[in-house]
């Protein structure tokens, strides 16, 4: 396991140097040279890299008290844009319910009787009141219920998320656990804490917390540009949509274990449970009691 601390190789999504179409270099030389034998095939593998990224730790007063490191698996720069784009499209597609439905002319009510005679009226011929040309008639090529979900491999989906997080480290920092500082819900206190940390309440900020304490959640839910996420609700869209990322020491440890180079491959059950939670809207619970074991 080799790591590099060079800052020149760090990913930067917000600088648009990695994901901007202008940064892609096109060469007239072939990317892949096929061997002379027509039976052998050569494929380009997605080489995964790792980089040790330092992040400052701030206390509740906004003072720097230490430093921690984020060590995530990331796609190489020449392939990162495609991997993140594919992960984003998959996330947005799988959120679609696909329940839109319209009635065709064969499904609308009525229309069995000819409205008026074919001839001798001076009007255009009309065969059915359910024609799409008439008000209340059917819809031509309207939407019908369908499944919009598309498949993306687990490893690639996790790589897209870790690459997006690593690309935003230039606008990220770590704060100490601050839930005990909110004895009661108060939005004014949360905004004051954000300003001490150097955050502008007008900018989109994402707080990644291990647990969502009630006082913290109620203090921040009135801030339109603020997003509070937990490991169960962490998703690629909110990471890319945020201008600032704020972590806690617990979430940094979670990310290094979950998306880092030492990630265990036998965590399928836990991964499926958390990824199912990502499809549920943030903060929405169905209230259904869990079945007794």
From Swiss-Prot:
Short name of one Pfam family: Ribosomal_L4
Where in the sequence is the transit peptide found? Answer: 1-50
Q: Alphabetically list the UniProt keywords.
A: Chloroplast, Plastid, Ribonucleoprotein, Ribosomal protein, RNA-binding, rRNA-binding, Transcription, Transcription regulation, Transcription termination, Transit peptide
Annotated GO CC locations: chloroplast; ribonucleoprotein complex; ribosome
**Region span, Disordered:** 107-138, 259-293
InterPro entries with a match to the protein in the record: Ribosomal_uL4, Ribosomal_uL4-like, Ribosomal_uL4_dom_sf
Q: List the Gene3D superfamilies.
A: 3.40.1370.10
List, as start-end ranges, the regions of compositional bias called Basic residues: 116-126
- Acidic residues bias: start-end ranges: 263-293
In the record, biological process GO terms are: DNA-templated transcription termination; translation
Instruction: Describe tissue expression.
Output: Highly expressed in cotyledon and weakly in roots.
Q: How does it assemble?
A: Component of the chloroplast large ribosomal subunit (LSU). Mature 70S chloroplast ribosomes of higher plants consist of a small (30S) and a large (50S) subunit. The 30S small subunit contains 1 molecule of ribosomal RNA (16S rRNA) and 24 different proteins. The 50S large subunit contains 3 rRNA molecules (23S, 5S and 4.5S rRNA) and 33 different proteins.
The family database entries (PANTHER family) matched by this protein are listed as: 50S RIBOSOMAL PROTEIN L4 (PTHR10746), LARGE RIBOSOMAL SUBUNIT PROTEIN UL4C (PTHR10746:SF17)
Any further remarks?
Answer: This protein (expressed without the transit peptide) is able to provoke transcription termination from the spinach chloroplast rDNA operon and the E.coli S10 operon in vitro.
Protein task: Component of the chloroplast ribosome (chloro-ribosome), a dedicated translation machinery responsible for the synthesis of chloroplast genome-encoded proteins, including proteins of the transcription and translation machinery and components of the photosynthetic apparatus.
Protein known as: Large ribosomal subunit protein uL4c
Gene name in the database record: RPL4
């Amino acid at each position: 396991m080799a790591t590099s601390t060079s800052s020149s190789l760090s990913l930067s999504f917000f600088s648009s140097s990695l994901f901007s179409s202008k940064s892609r270099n096109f060469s007239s030389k072939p990317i892949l040279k096929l061997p002379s034998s027509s039976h052998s095939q050569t494929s380009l593998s997605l080489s995964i890299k790792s980089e040790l990224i330092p992040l400052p730790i701030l206390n509740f007063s906004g003072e720097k008290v230490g430093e921690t490191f984020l060590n995530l698996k990331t796609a190489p720069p020449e392939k990162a844009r495609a991997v993140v784009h594919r992960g984003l499209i998959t996330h947005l597609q799988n959120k679609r319910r696909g329940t839109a439905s319209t009635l065709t002319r064969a499904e609308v009510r009525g229309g069995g009787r000819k409205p008026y005679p074919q001839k001798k009226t001076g009007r255009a011929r009309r065969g059915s009141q359910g024609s799409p040309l008439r008000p209340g008639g059917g819809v031509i090529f309207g939407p019908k219920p369908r499944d919009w979900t598309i498949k993306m491999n687990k490893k690639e989906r996790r790589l897209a998320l870790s690459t997006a997080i690593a690309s935003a480290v230039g606008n990220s920092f770590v704060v100490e656990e601050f839930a005990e500082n909110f004895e009661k819900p108060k939005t004014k206190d949360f905004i004051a804490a954000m300003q001490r940390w150097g955050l502008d309440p007008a900018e989109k900020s994402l707080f990644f917390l291990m647990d969502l304490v009630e006082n913290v959640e109620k203090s921040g839910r009135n801030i339109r540009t603020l997003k509070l996420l937990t490991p169960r609700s962490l998703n690629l869209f909110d990471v890319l949509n945020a201008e600032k990322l704020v972590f806690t020491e617990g979430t940094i440890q979670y990310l290094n274990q979950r998306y880092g180079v030492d990630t265990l491959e036998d965590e399928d059950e836990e991964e499926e449970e958390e990824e199912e939670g990502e499809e549920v809207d943030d903060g929405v619970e169905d209230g259904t009691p869990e079945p007794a074991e």
